């Protein structure tokens, strides 16, 4: 809800807020954050807000950019005290909008002092609401520790922020340092918009590496870990990130930031995800990600994806997501561009920069294609609806994901943009590509500072037509609104490849299974299971579904033998063609039954095969562009 005032407040209230905002523009709000208790999972803030006497409503940020939903972690806000000249000021929460606080500023008062604590979660899921601290590090998201005047534009409200760190800790951020001493640092005054867009990574074991030092503006890899060895990535990996910086310059022909910081948290004590910002990214991964080759490869998309968002999502942003403050609801209908195009370009950049080999890229692409070759939920819900409903889908979990669908605009969006790229290449005989669209669309205006240039569906269509004339509106809508069981595979076919299935998993699939401790039998028996035999998901209308299996059930035995993944694989192999059916003993909530799966197709794992006579456009796409 964006209307923050009760209807009876009337005009006098609006005037009071307006005068308060006017003063805030000439006298910034100061926000002092104390992180010395971060290892104990409690952060402290003191906020001093210039005000004028009368009614005032302040709000806690609700709709967080990049999270695409009303995810502001207000449930972990605590210790909210307001004083004026040392005397308490009573506040009252709005009865409808839980993020709004009403109060009356006493006569003669020109500023309010507010105390806010944030209880850093131990949860290993969620974005800024998830775990963000450990004994040796912390990631500060400013939106968790502030309020601001209601009905104001985030770009108009100015803040002077500062932080105080535990002894011996260092930090990285896109904010400019203004002053300070000891463990306290003051940053240059910025708008609320820029503040929320500029997290701070800090820790005891902190390292900063300058990337592609010959480029302007400057780029930095900032790392904080729970142990000193975890920030010692190899020279080879640093060189790959150097190339990533150069490849983005070659692709986007522009940069829209004063400097850029990859803020990488290496810890199992924090939630693992990536969250984009204009001049930085909040990248949280497992502790050994930079020193273990398998983990580095599996996480190879993360930094290219979040970096790409600086152009696609932060600079060029869907109009429905370009809201003026953090209380106005966002519209996610163009997330298939915001996230889908970013997923596509991020994967391509990972290959172009050498983070992945071309073969690793293709193996990952085969797993995406196979998932969307077997996506029954598409028959009732199109990819457009997953984008529109994004705000309720990020938290969706549990079984039957293939039937409910989730944030499919990421990976199915990637298939759509591969289709766009290969179509342009095919129509122009290789003379033009999606690179040309990106250079025009995201390079609009050349190099700029961090600002937002919104776009609509029609702008995307016009941008594609500026590269090559085509009925792009129909092209896109036919894919976005499709209810076919399988997602469109035109990008693979135009790229010179087709999806096939073989009896052995490719190296990428094997790495994913080893990392997650799960085993993927979706394309044979139609189920996904853990090492212990716990069924994590079942493919709707697949063999296991028709046999009566469901998520959460426990596989006890296979053909009379105690379950192991290898025993199940052997049973699938033995059943091929005219072999015996696979017989399972299954436990479900304390009850047991025998399930007979009459399947004879053998093991099936995805791979990409070349299509004879079609140019290998996919390999052309993966070639480095930087000179």
Predicted regions and their residues:
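Acidic/histidine-rich catalytic neighborhood
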Residues: 285, 316-384
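N-terminal secretory signal peptides that target proteins for export/translocation
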Residues: 1-5
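Bacterial N-terminal signal peptides
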Residues: 9-20
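Juxtacatalytic substrate-recognition/specificity segment
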Residues: 47, 210-335, 341, 345
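Early extracytoplasmic/domain-onset interaction patches
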Residues: 25-63
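C-terminal recognition in membrane/secretory proteostasis and scaffolding
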Residues: 346, 356-627
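Extracytoplasmic
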Residues: 28, 42-44, 53-55, 75-77, ...
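Non-catalytic architectural context of zinc metalloproteases
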Residues: 36, 48-50, 65, 70-79, ...
